[in-house]
Amino acid sequence: MAKSSMKAREVKRAKLVAKFAEKRLALKAIINNPTTSDDDRWDAVLKLQGLPRDSSAARQRNRCSQTGRPHGYLRKFGLSRIKLREATMRGEVPGLRKASW
C-alpha cells in the first residue's frame, strides 16, 4: 500500500498539469515553429523552463485506485494486476474470468 502522501502528490501533479496545459502547449508551439525568430524562441524556452516541474505530463504516474501501487497498473481497469486478480476471483469484474484452454 502506497503512503497517502504519495497518492496526494499524484493528485497535486494532475491538477498542475491541467492548470498549465494550455500555457505549455502555446510555448511549445512557439518553440517548434520554424518561422519564429531566435530571440522569441529563446524567450519561450526560458518561460517553459520557468513553469513548475510537476506541471509536465511526463512526471505523472498511473497508480492503482485501491492501493496506490505504481507498477503493474492496467489502464482499462484503473487497478494493479494484483487487485484486478482479486476482484476477478471474487467475480466483481463483469466479463472477465480466469483463462482456461
From Swiss-Prot:
Function: Binds 16S rRNA, required for the assembly of 30S particles and may also be responsible for determining the conformation of the 16S rRNA at the A site.
GO BP terms: translation
Keyword RNA-binding part of the UniProt annotation: yes
Keywords on record: Ribonucleoprotein, Ribosomal protein, RNA-binding, rRNA-binding
Gene: rpsN
Disulfide bond positions: none
Subunit (UniProt): Part of the 30S ribosomal subunit. Contacts proteins S3 and S10.
NCBIfam families, A to Z: PRK08881.1
Organism: Shewanella woodyi (strain ATCC 51908 / MS32)
One GO cellular component term noted in the UniProt record for this chain: cytoplasm
Protein's recorded name: Small ribosomal subunit protein uS14
Keyword Disulfide bond: no
Recorded family membership: Belongs to the universal ribosomal protein uS14 family.
GO MF, one example: structural constituent of ribosome
